[in-house]
A protein has these predicted regions:
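Short alpha-helical transmembrane segments in multi-pass integral membrane proteins
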Residues: 1-25, 82-149, 191-247, 304-369, ...
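N-terminal transmembrane alpha-helices
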Residues: 9-49, 62-77, 81, 106-113, ...
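Residue-level signal for transmembrane alpha-helical positions in Major Facilitator Superfamily
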Residues: 19, 34-35, 74, 115-119, ...
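Interfacial/gating helices of multi-pass transporter permease domains
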Residues: 20, 43-65, 132-136, 196-197, ...
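Transmembrane helical elements of multi-pass membrane transporters/channels
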Residues: 20-39, 143, 177, 206-210, ...
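Helix-terminus/linker motif at the lipid-water interface of multi-pass membrane proteins
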Residues: 30, 34-55, 124-131, 187-194, ...
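Small-residue-rich hydrophobic transmembrane alpha-helices
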Residues: 54-114, 151-170, 264, 278-336, ...
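Short runs within selected transmembrane alpha-helices of multi-pass transporters and secretion channels
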Residues: 75, 144-162, 170-178, 199-212, ...
Length: 456
């Protein structure tokens, strides 16, 4: 089985192989997104409190993103290293990476659970919570935080299944959890009357099932690389390269948290709870664009990394071209949808007429440049697949830290409608970041391939 997977990666037709890995990865990303979207859809329609509760849950997003950031520090850093080691025929090294990564995820879970549980109320105030929305944010957040170990294991260990070529198994991890979440949400939120607490409990339970599924597979007979007890002890020489490569994804997600704080605090200042509520809806919708793109890149990563490790330059190039075409095509279709029917999309998340109206105009502004994001993510993630941690990190910082976050605070000073200025920062940064990232990638791509995997 292992030999067949390696043969497919190194010699099978590239496009069918990519689709075989990308489709389950995209489905997994979309299904994983349902954990939060389904919660928000149900919460937004709770009679009498829907808009306030939805806004409160949205304010918890920065903490949720930080949890995901620590998970992907390990998953996004370890999976490419594992694939490169496997491509070079070093199975023992690949299994050491998996074992060390698992231990680090458990360590992060303990530290983050203690810190975020104690600091949740103060942090949520800082993010822009009002007296009306804080109770819902705390109620949802503290339960979610208590289950963070399952969140980190699912997000952090699932890439190690995908990178071995078991994309369908990886997809089932999120499908199983999402189905359980969808079933439990209405029962706990409405049936038992638990409200936002019910949504959090449903999410934690579904993530726990997903974590058990992953551990069963990685310790079972079907996997190529096993999670072994003898490799759980952390070794500096093993974990530091993982952290070095994963820091790019960590920065991407942690700055996403900082970005969310910047948006929510600015909008709370200029527009109050309704503006923050609109941003909650817009953020959920925008993830329907960005996460499938990341799924495409996640599916392409094992093929690019393996063939880079094996020194097969032409196959790496073919994989990248196909990945870029899919990413740009998807973002173009998504952009057309957002420009055409933003009000219909907003109505899925809330029945509050005022919130729908506000979200409709805000969404058109925010999404105006999103078609360019496909180019930026495809290029930036390809740097990761090729082991180029420093360049990938710089590009991860570019859009959010260097461009978007400053623009959120600068642009409102140049327009009469301050909230318009806040939302306008997004498309401006999207277009600038995509242009710079594409130029950087295409000027370096051939040089990286010529150097080969030995210097990754």
């Amino acid at each position: 089985m292992a030999a067949q997977n390696r043969q497919d990666m190194g010699s099978g037709p590239v496009k069918p192989l990519l689709l075989q890995l990308m489709i389950p990865a995209v489905v997994a990303q979309v299904v994983n997104l349902l954990y939060n979207i389904v919660d928000r859809i149900y919460i937004g329609h709770i009679e009498g409190i829907g808009a306030a509760a939805l806004t409160g849950v949205g304010l918890f997003a920065p903490i949720l993103m930080l949890l995901n950031a620590f998970a992907m520090l390990i998953g996004a850093g370890g999976a490419p290293r594992t694939a490169i080691a496997l491509g070079q025929g070093n199975k023992e090294d690949a299994e050491k990476i998996i074992g060390n990564s698992f231990t680090m995820l458990l360590f992060f879970a303990v530290v983050l659970t203690i810190g975020f549980y104690a600091g949740a109320p103060a942090l949520l105030r800082l993010f822009g919570a009002s007296d009306a929305t804080l109770p819902y944010a705390v109620a949802y957040g503290r339960i979610y935080i208590l289950g963070s170990v399952f969140v980190l294991l699912v997000m952090g260990m699932n890439p190690f299944i995908t990178t071995q070529g078991f994309a369908k198994i990886s997809m089932l991890t999120t499908v199983i959890g999402a189905v359980i979440n969808i079933i439990l949400d209405p029962i706990l939120i409405f049936g038992l009357g638990w409200g936002v607490r019910g949504a959090a409990v449903a999410t934690v339970l579904s993530q726990a099932v997903g974590a058990c599924w992953i551990l069963k597979f990685l310790t079972g007979p079907k996997t190529i690389l096993k999670l072994r007890k003898e490799y759980l002890r952390v070794e500096r020489g093993v974990i530091l390269p993982v952290l070095g490569l994963g820091i790019s994804s960590f920065v991407m997600l942690s700055t996403e948290s900082l970005l969310s704080i910047s948006f929510s605090s600015s909008l709370a200042c200029y527009g109050g709870d309704i503006a923050v509520g609109a941003m909650t809806v817009i953020t959920s919708v925008s993830q329907l664009c960005t996460l499938p793109i990341q799924g495409i890149c996640q599916g392409g990563q094992p093929v690019m990394s393996f063939n880079f490790g094996a020194g097969k330059k032409a196959r790496v190039k073919e994989a990248f071209r196909f990945q870029l075409t899919l990413c740009f095509g998807y973002t173009t279709l998504f952009w057309l949808l957002m420009m055409a029917v933003p009000g219909v999309v907003a109505g899925i998340f809330t029945s509050d007429a005022a919130l729908i109206d506000y979200t409709t105009w805000a969404m058109r502004i925010y999404m105006a440049g999103i078609l360019a994001m496909g180019v930026q993510i495809a290029c930036q993630q390809s740097f990761m697949a090729l082991g180029q941690a420093k360049v990938s990190l710089l590009l991860a910082c570019l859009r959010k830290i260097i461009l978007l976050i400053p623009l959120i605070f600068i642009l409102p000073h140049f327009v009469a409608d301050k909230c318009f200025g806040v939302f306008l920062a997004e498309p401006v940064s999207d277009l600038l970041a995509a242009t710079i990232t594409a130029i950087t990638f295409f000027s370096r791509f051939d040089k990286i391939l010529d150097r080969g995997a030995g210097r990754a």
